[in-house]
């Protein structure tokens, strides 16, 4: 199944970019995400083509996107020669049991930075969810982690590599009570 989307949209960068901030299970965005994509994330005009692969044992989706580099992102800048951010995202979703799922994703992004060269970002996301069928409104557990690696080229002799990650757990202990914890580590994607 192919799906074409044209317009302004939140890009499929890892797990949290396509989700509006008020729907996230934490108060502030992870530092690694903000350092690479900004407070607003990657939200640009462009085109997206997604393909739901014909696999029977698990869900797999492949997404390609080209968008105008107009977001206020620390990693990308709308340059004179290159105006687009190119993104590829592979999402795999496995049903482990009636109560548990695992989602694994890979993302690659390339686009212009403020020195008229390119920044390349690779990301990996992993999410485990457990929600027992018989107690699904009262009990659940989620573990989600995302890892980012950036290579920003500023000239033929100057490149800056950086790394960031976050991991959080959320344990639902009652119908409307959740215990959540998160760890962040973030380097800056630029050289100052």
Task: Show which residues each predicted segment covers.
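Surface-exposed flexible segments
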Residues: 84-86, 160
């Amino acid at each position: 199944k192919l799906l074409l989307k044209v317009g302004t949209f939140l890009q499929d960068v890892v797990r949290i970019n396509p989700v509006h901030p008020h729907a996230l299970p934490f108060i502030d965005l992870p530092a690694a995400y903000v350092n690479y994509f900004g407070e607003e994330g990657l939200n640009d005009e462009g085109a997206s083509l997604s393909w739901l692969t014909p696999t029977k044992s698990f869900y797999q989706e492949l997404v390609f996107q080209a968008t105008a580099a107009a977001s206020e992102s620390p990693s990308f800048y709308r340059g004179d020669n290159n105006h687009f951010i190119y993104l590829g995202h592979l999402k795999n979703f496995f049903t482990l049991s009636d109560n548990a799922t695992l989602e694994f994703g890979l993302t690659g992004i390339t686009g212009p930075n403020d020195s008229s060269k390119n920044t390349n970002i690779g990301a990996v996301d992993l999410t485990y969810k457990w929600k027992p069928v018989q107690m699904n409104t009262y009990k659940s557990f989620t573990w989600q982690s995302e890892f980012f690696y950036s290579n920003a080229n500023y000239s033929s002799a100057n490149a800056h590599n950086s790394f960031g990650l976050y991991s959080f757990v959320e344990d639902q202990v009652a119908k409307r009570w959740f215990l959540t914890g998160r760890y962040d580590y973030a380097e800056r994607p630029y050289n100052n």
